[in-house]
From Swiss-Prot:
One of its GO terms (molecular function) is 4 iron, 4 sulfur cluster binding. This is Ferredoxin-1. InterPro entries: 4Fe4S_Fe-S-bd (IPR017896), 4Fe4S_Fe_S_CS (IPR017900), 7Fe_ferredoxin (IPR000813), Fd_C (IPR022569), FdxA (IPR054829), RnfB_subfamily (IPR050294). It comes from Azotobacter vinelandii. [4Fe-4S] cluster binds at residues 21, 40, 43, 46. Residues 84-107 are annotated as: Disordered. Binds 1 [4Fe-4S] cluster. Keywords: 3Fe-4S, 4Fe-4S, DNA-binding, Electron transport, Iron, Iron-sulfur, Metal-binding, Repeat, Transport. Residues 96-107 have a biased composition (Basic and acidic residues).
Length: 107
């Protein structure tokens, strides 16, 4: 079972998780990261590294965020792989913790 990036990553895009991933299974969009479910080895190293607490094991994704399981799978097929940490988005602190950010997802 893979890990899943959820709502709170949108418009924050901290990349601390990318830095610790041993299999480079993160993919980067304009304002969101996703995990490729077929590449994730379920090591759980990324989950505690996320300052926004946006990463969950697939079986622990909150009920109101279930759509992110499929979203991660879909976007990982079209976005480029990211393997190194980058600066978060400029207004990440303002968006961290804001609920219901899916409408702000840039594809």
């Amino acid at each position: 079972m893979a890990f899943v990036v959820t709502d709170n990553c949108i418009k924050c895009k901290y990349t601390d998780c990318v830095e610790v991933c041993p299999v480079d299974c993160f993919y980067e969009g304009p304002n969101f990261l996703v995990i490729h479910p077929d590449e994730c080895i379920d090591c759980a190293l990324c989950e505690p590294e996320c300052p926004a607490q946006a990463i969950f094991s697939e079986d622990e994704v909150p009920e109101d965020m279930q759509e992110f399981i499929q979203l991660n799978a879909e976007l990982a097929e079209v976005w480029p792989n990211i393997t190194e940490k980058k600066d978060p988005l400029p207004d990440a602190e303002d968006w961290d913790g804001v609920k219901g950010k899916l409408q702000h997802l840039e594809r």
